[in-house]
Amino acid sequence: MPYRISRQAYAETYGPTTGDRLRLADTELILEVEKDFTVYGDEVKFGGGKVIRDGMGQSQTPRAGGAVDTVITNALILDWWGIVKADVGLKDGRIVGIGKAGNPDTQAGVTIVVGPGTEAIAGEGHILTAGGIDTHIHFICPQQIETALASGMTTLMGGGTGPATGTNATTCTPGAFHIGRMLQAAEGLPVNLGFFGKGNASTPEALEEQVRAGACGLKLHEDWGTTPATIDACLSVADRMDVQVCIHTDTLNEAGFVEDTIAAIKGRTIHTFHTEGAGGGHAPDIIKICGEANVLPSSTNPTRPYTRNTLEEHLDMLMVCHHLDPRIPEDVAFAESRIRRETIAAEDILHDLGAFSIIASDSQAMGRVGEVITRTFQTAHKMKVQRGALPQDSSRNDNHRLKRYIAKVTINPALAHGISSEVGSIETGKLADLVLWKPGFFGIRPEVVIKGGSIVWAQMGDANASIPTPGPVHGRPMFGAFGKALAPSCLTFVSEAAMDSDIQRHLGLERTCMAVKDTRSVGKSALKLNSALPKVSVDPQTYEVFADGELLTCEPAEVLPLAQRYLLL
């Protein structure tokens, strides 16, 4: 006779199962388990008197015979493709199984073999997501990497050379010399990295040189002059060399209006940064570009979500980042032209509709590198409160909304930048870049961050204590982030042209270099759960935003979850 236990007791022991629901942190977002891949009665769990013991849940299978290096037991996976309970097997730094772990000699339905060489990570009672991907990094200081990792980000892409004036304003690593130095600096940083060259040139030679030197993309920024000529030249080089182009358009409309930029793009794939416009771009209507099928639109997190403080903090941020002088009226007018409550409010709704596809940070250049995931789910919460359930959801859960928003910081930036074969989702064959969260701290404080199959960051107590848990407990780097363990766990993304020129040997790099690919064929339709193409217009007098004729407006949030309740200092 099978032994029956209550649903509550089961969830407390093995984690929630099909039909169970839970709240994410202090938000109004409710998650419901769609499927459980484990087998009732044959679940695996580690510990004294538990299942993963020799001859029980642990087989005699050696690593060479198929046993995994690590098993994450009973994890609740939240990814764009589903919300499921499963065991996850890791081997050689990759995800090799999502299903039922254990001993096939004694248990039913085993798809992930646990052996004497298998380490166990307890996933029961935890949410498992793919490591976050931030594709709008100003590499101003190396301390950003630890801050990002502590928030659940495992891949950072952008540009910069340190606290140079150009880097403070623009996401570019200009020229072969600086690209080489940044690729060498990446050797000691425990995340995947990729660097954008400067895309502002009207002829191709200097752009091609940067791509051959190791740039994985090119960035067009108005502070360097984003004219129709530079847009066309940059995209032409990108099409030939298969790298992505990111663009910060012309706020002042000096070289043309948004229609002229769209014409210069000529239907080619492009990633538009801070597409609402407060971070920069054609004033007041760059936001309409999100309705173009070839445009991959993203937001940066200072406008996520729209709150009572958003407008006030932006002016000073903008003046500092873009080297403006508050004593010059024209500089102040430039800054003020970018900050519009109407377009920021509309941005919230366009994210909820799936018309904006990606959220990134704009680190130390009007954005906060450690708040990408937090701001993403604050936006989801605000939209749930203000707009109610999505049509695809029900009164029981917000599953579709949760999948839509997790896609904005995982799979969609990976697809946009040609790295989705390696990272961006919890799928077999991909790098084991994974984040475990306690549900009560989801989106604000990861419990464990796994990078390439090794733990690189975790909540940890006093190192002199007799057990791991006495306070002060806070996030700390772990063994996977040190020594020669770091290089095999991380990827450096470059161009195919750089791989052909043997950039790894030329620069003496130990990390694996990986070429981005298929960046020019991806369109908005490829972006998961965020491919809506509304016809967007902006009233030039009032700045009101309309999508398919409907006014998009919402009130600023007065209070947000994932905020001071969790961050007292």
From Swiss-Prot:
Residues the record lists as binding Ni(2+) 2: 219, 248, 274
Residues carrying N6-carboxylysine: 219
Q: Which domain of life is it from?
A: Bacteria
Known Pfam families for this protein? Amidohydro_1 (PF01979), Urease_alpha (PF00449)
Which InterPro entries is this protein grouped with? Amidohydro-rel, Metal-dep_hydrolase_composite, Metal_Hydrolase, Urease_alpha_N_dom, Urease_alpha_subunit, Urease_AS, Urease_asu, Urease_asu_c
- List the EC numbers from the record: 3.5.1.5
Which PANTHER family does UniProt cross-reference here? UREASE
**Annotated compartments:** Cytoplasm
Entry GO CC? cytoplasm
* PROSITE patterns, sorted: UREASE_1, UREASE_2, UREASE_3
The subunit field of the Swiss-Prot or TrEMBL record says: Heterotrimer of UreA (gamma), UreB (beta) and UreC (alpha) subunits. Three heterotrimers associate to form the active enzyme.
Q: List the keywords (alphabetical).
A: Cytoplasm, Hydrolase, Metal-binding, Nickel
Essential cofactor(s)? Ni cation
| NCBIfam families reported for this sequence | PRK13206.1 (NF009685), PRK13207.1 (NF009686), urease_alph (TIGR01792)
Q: Name one GO molecular function term.
A: urease activity
From the Swiss-Prot or TrEMBL record, give the protein name.
Answer: Urease subunit alpha
Give the organism the record lists: Synechococcus sp. (strain WH7805)
Tell me the residue numbers annotated for binding Ni(2+) 1: 136, 138, 219, 362
Could you tell me what reaction this enzyme catalyses? urea + 2 H2O + H(+) = hydrogencarbonate + 2 NH4(+)
Domain (Urease): give its ranges. Answer: 131-569
Similarity field = Belongs to the metallo-dependent hydrolases superfamily. Urease alpha subunit family.
- Cite the pH-dependence comment: Optimum pH is 8.6.
User: Which HAMAP family does this chain map to?
Assistant: Urease_alpha (MF_01953)
Q: In which pathway does it act?
A: Nitrogen metabolism; urea degradation; CO(2) and NH(3) from urea (urease route): step 1/1
Per the UniProt entry, the dependence of activity on temperature is:
Optimum temperature is 45 degrees Celsius.
